[in-house]
Structures are given as structure tokens and as C-alpha cells.
From Swiss-Prot:
The species this protein was found in: Bacillus subtilis (strain 168)
InterPro entries found in the cross-reference section: PilZ_domain, T3SS_YcgR_PilZN
Source organism, top-level taxon: Bacteria
Protein name: Uncharacterized protein YpfA
Molecular-function annotations in GO: cyclic-di-GMP binding
Domain PilZ: 98-203
Gene3D superfamilies: predicted glycosyltransferase like domains (2.40.10.220)
Amino acid sequence: MIEIGENVLLEYIEENELKKAKSKAVSIENNELLIAYPVDVVTGRTVILHNDMEVTVEFVGKDEVPYRFISRIKGKVKDKLQMICLEMPPREKMKRIQRRQYVRTDAVLDVQIQPGNEEEIRTLSYNISAGGIAVVLADGLSFQSGESLRLIIRLPEEEHTRQIETEAVVRRIFNDPKSEKRKMTLEYSEIAAGDQQALLQYCIRRQLNKRRKARME
């Protein structure tokens, strides 16, 4: 199910607060998953996970479908690098993550729309998730619900900007009375597993930052 080197996302409770950390799968054997030391998705700092701590693990499988399962920390393993050992449940204990479960966040990102053989259109997103995106439409642009478009999304990461290319299907076009702008929502139909994982981690980071800022106000 999990490929070696695949990104994994961990959720756990610490001091009554939901925390999220990212890591990579290093080895799988004897119903155990070994991962590199995880780092907090917001601070980028290495996190300490105690033995017997319950964690939720999310990953994108070989079939490019996202999955989730509940696990426990079994301990630390020292080899060429330090690793964390997790319980690995059987496949039937892993749950597929449905598209509606993707974390969604407000975000203004540069987006290029490529409608068939026509000239590309540059616009901005206002909302995004690992399952789809919502963009602003300039006056005069017209698309149909169900139409397939190619998108290029510029996603800011810690050290560089990631360019995500994906096929997407138009789901809805509407007029927003608050902004007085036309908007369009799209669902990704073809997207690389690594790009989808990057989008998921980006949305989670923004949500956690938003919550922390709200608590400080």
C-alpha cells in the first residue's frame, strides 16, 4: 500500500491540541512501518512522539488514492538514520479518504487555465483543497459545467514555488454578490499523487496558522 519514500502525514493530540507532522516512509516489514523523524507542518521543527502514543496516518497509495489509518508509536529505531516505528494495520483497516474530506482553505494563488487549443488564461484562486480549486473569472470568459480544462497552479512551498499541472472538470459557475465577481469551481480529474499530497499539506498549514492567529487575538 505505502511505497518506500512516500510522504506520510501524522495527526496526534498533544496538550489537548491537534498537531500535524510530515515524514517519509523508510521501511515496511513485519506489520511495522518505519518513518523518518517527523517535522511539524507549521514550524518545520522535529517533533517528539512518545511510545504508545496514538496517531492517525495519512498517505497516498500505489493506486494514487489517499488512505488513512489509526496507529500507535512502538518506539525508536537507530540504523543509518533515526526512525520511528509505527504499528501497520492490515489493508482492510485502512480507510479511503473521500474527496469531501479534503481540507479546504482560502488562498490567492496564480493559476493558468488552458482550454483546449485556445490561448491560456491567467487568473487567481480564492479557495483551494487537495480535491479541487475555486477561481475568479474575468468578464467575457465562458465555460460550461462538465467541461475539462488543464490547470497550472503555482503553489508556494518552504524553499521554492511548486508548479502543479492537473486536469480539472468545471463543476459550477456563479456570480458572487459580495465581491461582485464571477467565480468558477473545479474538481481535479487527473493529478499526480505527489502534487495532491503537497496541496493537502499546504491547506493544513494554512488552517493551523489561521487557528493559532485566532487564539492569539
